[in-house]
Each structure stands twice: as C-alpha cells, then as structure tokens.
UniProtKB/Swiss-Prot annotation:
Transit peptide location on this chain: 1-29
Name of the protein described by the UniProt record: ATPase synthesis protein 25, mitochondrial
Keyword Electron transport in annotation: no
Species annotation: Paracoccidioides brasiliensis (strain Pb18)
Localization terms from the record: Mitochondrion inner membrane
Any one GO cellular component localisation term in the record: mitochondrial inner membrane
InterPro entries per the UniProt record, alphabetical: Atp25, NT_sf
Family indicated by similarity: Belongs to the ATP25 family.
Membrane topology: Peripheral membrane protein
Region (Disordered): 68-93
Entry's Gene Ontology BP terms: mitochondrial gene expression; mRNA stabilization
C-alpha cells in the first residue's frame, strides 16, 4: 500500500481500519483496541513524523505472516509504545522513509517452474551444482531432472557411479547449439573430454547435407525418388557423457565390497555424469526416465542389502536320485519317495553331480539311479514317440498331390476314421500332451484350408484357436503365422457375378482378431511377417483398373485388367497408404520377398509411380537387385502385354542392370525373358534389327541371342558326353 495514502489518512481509527482490511485479506487478524480504554490524550491524533511508516511496516513483513500472534498484538504494542517511545525515537538516528528497505514478495513467473533446479543427491560431486546451473541458466534447458544411479548393482552399461541428468530443448536447433556449447564449456573450464552421441559438428553437418544432395541426384538419375524416414541429421536426442569427475562416490564397507566383488582390475574413483538432452516430443516418446526409475525400483527390491555368500547346495536331479555310500537303505527309500516326479514338459532335462566317483557305494550299482515313477516315464516316452511321428505324417501329406491330399483329409472336421491318414493321426494325437495335441490339430486344419478343402472352414479354425489360447497353451510365432496364412487364403474368381477379386470382409475380420490376440500374448506384430500379409490381404488378387460406378457394368476387360468401382479402388488405396505409413514409422525391415510382393501389387493396380518408387527403395534399403529382381521385372512386363511400358522398361532398366554392384549379366534364363519384352516392344525386331532402332536395343538383342545359343550348345555337349559315357563298358 502506498505510503502517500497512509500519510494522507489523518485519523488513527481510519488508518487502523484500512490496515485491518488489507491484513485480513492476507489471512491475519488484528484485535481492535477497546473503546473505553482509550484516553482523551491517546485519542488525539499523534504527531505525524517520519517514523510512522517505520512502526507500521512490521505488519507487512515476513514475521507478521509467519507468526499471526505477532500481528494480532501489533495494535496493543503500538498504543503502548506511543506513551513512552517518543523521547526514545527522537534520540535514535532518523531514517527517511524513502531510504528504508521494503520486503516485497515477488510472484513466481509461470515459466519459473520449468527452470527449477532438481535437488542434489546425497554426497554429490562438487561440479554437479555448477553443472546444473549452467545447463539451466546459460544454455537454457527446461524441466531438469536428476536420477542417482550410483546404487545400481550390477552397474549400467554407461559405467558405475552414474548420475544422469535430463533436460528438454525448445527445438532441434536449440538442442544442437546447446550440446555444442555445453561440450565446449566443459573442455575450456574443466579440461574434460565429453563425448556427445548424436551431436553433429559444424563441418560434419555440412558433409552430411552434401552427401544427401549427391545421393538424391544419383537416385533421380536412376528413375526413383529419395524417401527415407530418417536422414540421420535430425534425431532430437543428444547424449552427452561428461566423463568421470572427482568426488561423489558412495562409500561401501570394505568387507562387504570384497565379498561381492567379481572380476579383476582396479575400482575407478569418481562419478560419471551423463546429460540426456532431448526435444519435448522425443522425451515424451521414449520416456527414458520411467525406464530408469523402473530399473532403480527393481534394483532396490532385488538388492535390499549386499549379497552374502551362501553354501553351495547339491544339485537337484529330476527323475533320478544319486546317493553316496553313507546313505542307509531306509533313508534311500525315503529320499526316493520324496523326489519330485517327472514333469512331461517335453524338454530335455539334464543334471550334474559334483560328488566324486570314489565315494559311491561299491556294494551295488543298481541303486545309483532309480526311476521315481515308471508309469510317468513310460508316458513320457510314448509322448516323445508321438512327437516324432506327427511331423512325419505332415511330411507325407505335403509330398502328395493336392487332390490326393484332400482325399486323405476325409470329409471334414468331424471325420476321424474314413482314411488311414486320419486314423493314424488321431491315434498319435491321443498319446501326446494336450498343448501339443491342440497345436497339431490347428496345423491340420490350416493345411486343409490352404488346400481349399470344402469340409474345413475358417470359422472352425478360429474357434479352435480361441480354445487353444483360453487353455493357456504356448503360442509360438510360427503357429500364429500359419493360422494367419490359412485365414487370409483366397482364390480370386473373375467369372463370378460380381467378380470376387478381394478377400471377404468376414475373413479379414477373423485375421485381425487373430493378430490382436497374438499381440496380447506378447507377439511383435510390427514386423514384416504380419504387416506385409495384411497389405497383400487388402489388395486385389488380379490386375484391375478403376472406372466410375455407373460405367462398371458396361466396362470391358482391357489389357488383362478387370474393371472395378473407383470408390472401392480408392478405399483400397487409402488402407495401403496407412499400412505403408506404419511400415515407415515403425522402421520395419523388409526383405527381397516382401519388396517383390509390393511391386506385384502396384503393378496389378496400375500404379506405376508407386511401382518405381518401391523399386528405388530396394536399393536404399541396402538390398542387392540381382537376377531374381530383373527376372521378376521383365516377366511382369511380358505378362502385361503393354508395348509402351515394355519399351520404357527396356530403355531404363538394361543400363541399370550393368550398374548394379555386382553387375547383372545375361544368362540363358534372363536372356529368354528379355527377348520376350523386346519382341513385345518391337514386333519387327528380326526384320529391322539394323534399321531405325536404338543402339541399346540392338546390342541387347544380340547379347540375348548369343546367350541362348551358348546355352543350347552346352546342353548338346552334355547330352553327347552322357551318351558316350553310357556306351563305355563298366569296370
């Protein structure tokens, strides 16, 4: 409250009311003086000297707020001081009001909370406080957090006695500038050698940008575009390892430290400090602090104290007991009865014994190893034989022709006796363990559905899968992929009305529910095995082209392509685009087979721009485009029958073959396919091979003819050699 306003109020009661109103708003109560106790002399307005603000400034000091009793008695103290303090005040040194210091509490700025320093841990290194102040004030990182990882046992990979600091940068540029400035400050001030992982130096950034531009030019010349989810320039995360600083090492008792020490070498004195600098998005994405906190909690539960050495216990032998010569017959029989029975978990169980052979009982070797339960052991042996015979049955079924294999599978799910294969299969199934029997039954149903057996339905397969997971049986990744292939199995029928060119929605729903259940059981579904299967399932299974819905019935099949509605075609494209975004965001590694499947889908849908983009991404992924890729490419264009596309592909891809690392040269198989494309693009190639044709096509045509003739000559020589060897007399 302004002093001018207080001095302007001449009445003592008015001043008290004004002061009481402001003080009551701050939560402090003042007891007003009794009216009857005020004498006429005291009721007279006091002399307004310069000491008036000095007496009343105590009401707004920190003491009045901290102790309400002092503020409550302020009026009585002032009234008592008025009687005898005037001579004393005159004797004191006069201090004008404009020279007196005021205690003002400044309101905290909202951004102040982001710049608060974290509390120091126990026994911190001397440099830690200065380090935190520099990170917060000079380079401007927000939301600082400090984790004390010195108690971790075993220590983390960054090193023992670790203290980790987290900070948020305001942008990627601020992140790089802050890390560079921080490292330079550590080098110049403390002569440290920090290691900043993820920081690009000024010259290194220029080099990377120059290389990226050069790579983009090379890719553009190859007929593709540069598309990479991560260019390696902006990561949003820089880890600065300050190094080992003096002090801050937690002390441990000598005896306990020697007992728990394993290894060799000297213990390094000091504390390692690591500063994690991240942008706000990257910090929320990886949530590194939560991971380290979980590690600390687990470490505190696992190691409440230093471990104490324990005496070595004898090994526990499952299924057999080993006794020494000092064990009596009664004790021996008791030990046998108390031995746990054999568990049929279908794994090979081993045990070792540390007792010496000379201490064994020499009176008889029959008591050295005694089976605990003969019935369980016999059942386990039968189960093992069943496990060996079931794969042989599936191997026999896979070697049959599709029609004969369908006959061996009988009438359907309920048929168990119509064929010898089913009889033997279910006999072996009854001998094996429940979890293996359930998995083998699922395998049989998948095989039947993939063979397009009409008696086995996908709904029954999914129901059997639900029973398998409800029983809490193991769900290996190979079994999930096998069931997924069966649910996504589909054969297009262009002659039906309307044409069946895509997987039905009900089958797709079952497949998605399968993937969801597998993810809940811990299977990694962000993998090429799952994503590419779904990508192919939502796509068309034959060559199509889009027309308007009104022209769908009148549109004809052109160029081996079937007309489809443009609305459905765009819906398929949207789903494919979302799946492609997931693949790029999750950085899913694709292989040769996956890229060939994607190329075929884009070719079937007539999306040539996406086709050549995917062709260029193969080289960017580090996959060699060898003979298999070019066989697929030229075969695809030969099947399409489009002479314009074939001509463009020949002119662009034949030089590309010779620029591959290693180059792809013509052999008889590849030359045959390229010859078909040349004959399609240039029908009169034989007559006009020397006239008005590009030199590249003429040269390629001669190479193909030469490769095919050489192959025929080699085959003729082999037949002659075989004929001569067949006529030679046997030794």
């Amino acid at each position: 409250m302004s002093r001018v306003l207080l001095r302007g109020i001449q009445c003592h009661a008015c001043r008290q009311n004004v002061i009481r109103s402001f003080v009551s708003a701050s939560g402090v109560t003042i007891t007003p003086p009794a009216i009857g106790s005020v004498s006429p002399s005291k009721a007279h307005p006091p002399h307004l000297s310069g000491s008036f603000p000095t007496r009343h400034v105590k009401l707004f000091s920190s003491q009045a707020k901290d102790d309400p009793s002092l503020a409550a008695d302020a009026v009585s103290e002032n009234s008592a001081a008025q009687e005898g303090s005037y001579p004393q005040e005159n004797s004191e040194q006069h201090v004008p009001w404009y020279l007196q210091e005021e205690v003002q509490e400044m309101a905290l700025h909202p951004m102040r909370q982001q710049q608060e320093l974290p509390p120091l841990p126990e026994n911190p290194p001397p440099i830690l406080k200065v380090l935190l102040e520099y990170i917060s004030v000079d380079i401007g990182l927000d939301n600082l957090n400090l984790l004390d990882l010195r108690t971790l046992d075993p220590p983390p990979a960054l090193g023992a006695n670790l203290i980790m600091i987290f900070g948020t940068a305001r942008s990627v540029k601020h992140l790089n500038v802050s890390a560079d400035k921080f490292c330079r400050w550590l080098r110049t001030t403390y002569k440290l050698r920090p290691d900043a992982d993820g920081l690009l130096g000024r010259n290194e950034l220029k080099i990377k940008l120059r290389r990226k531009a050069r790579r983009a030019r090379l890719i553009k010349r190859a007929g593709s575009t540069l598309k990479q989810p991560d260019d390696g320039i902006t990561t949003g995360w820089i880890c600065v390892d300050v190094g080992i600083v003096e002090g801050g090492q937690l002390s441990k008792p000598e005896g306990v430290q020697k007992a728990g020490f394993v290894g060799f070498g000297t213990v390094i004195q000091g504390t390692r400090i690591v500063v994690q600098m991240m942008t706000e998005e990257k910090r929320e994405e990886i949530d590194l602090e939560s991971l380290w906190r979980q590690t600390l909690e687990k470490n505190s539960m696992d190691n409440p104290g230093l471990p104490k050495p324990q005496a070595e216990e004898p090994p526990q032998v499952v299924g057999f007991t080993h006794e020494s010569s000092t064990v009596t017959a009664a004790d021996f029989s008791h030990r046998v009865s108390q031995t746990p029975p054999i568990r049929a978990n279908y794994e090979q169980l081993r045990s070792i014994s540390t007792s010496l052979h000379r201490l064994r009982d020499k009176r008889g070797s029959a008591t050295d190893f005694v089976p605990t339960d003969t019935t369980v052991a016999t059942k386990s042996a039968k189960s093992t034989s069943s496990q060996e015979s079931l794969p042989s049955l599936f191997n026999y079924l896979s070697n049959l022709e599709p029609d004969k294999a369908i006959d061996e599978l009988g009438q359907g799910m309920d048929d168990r006796t119509s064929t010898s294969f089913l009889q033997r299969f279910y006999e072996e199934l009854a001998r094996t363990a429940p979890q293996i029997a359930s998995a083998q039954k699922l395998e049989l149903m998948c095989t039947a559905i993939l063979l397009q057996h009409s008696g086995y339905r996908k709904e029954d397969l999914f129901q059997a899968f639900k029973e398998h997971i409800v029983s809490n049986y193991p769900l290996p990744r190979a079994l999930v992929l096998r069931i997924l292939d069966a649910l996504l199995a589909f054969k297009p029928d262009p002659n039906s009305n309307p044409p069946r060119l895509r997987l039905p929605g009900a089958d797709m729903e079952l497949a998605l529910r399968l993937i969801e259940n597998a993810a809940l059981r811990g299977t990694n579904i962000l993998h090429a095995d799952f994503l590419i299967r779904v990508f192919l399932a939502v796509s068309y299974r034959t060559r199509v082209y889009a027309v308007k819905p009104g022209n769908l019935h009148s549109a004809a099949i052109t160029g081996n392509r079937i007309p489809v509605s443009i609305d459905e075609f765009e819906s398929v494209q949207r789903i494919q685009t979302r799946l492609a975004s997931i693949i790029r965001a999750a950085k899913v590694a694709l292989g040769e087979k996956e890229y060939l499947d994607i190329l075929r889908v884009h070719s079937d849908q007539g999306e040539y721009a996406k086709f050549w983009n995917a062709w260029g991404e193969v080289a960017l992924a580090g996959i060699h485009r060898g003979k298999s890729f070019y066989l697929f490419l030229f075969n695809l264009h030969a099947e399409l029958g489009d002479w314009q596309q074939s001509r463009t592909t020949l002119l662009n891809c034949i030089p590309m073959m010779w620029r591959e690392d290693p180059p792809v040269f013509f052999d008889a198989e590849l030359a045959e396919v390229v010859s078909k494309c040349i004959a399609l693009a240039y029908p009169d190639i034989d007559d006009t091979v020397q006239h008005n044709l590009p030199a590249l096509i003429v040269k390629t045509w001669h190479h193909c003819r030469t490769a095919i003739q050489n192959q025929k000559m080699n085959e003729r020589k082999e037949r002659l050699i075989q004929t001569e060897l067949g006529t030679l007399p046997e030794n």
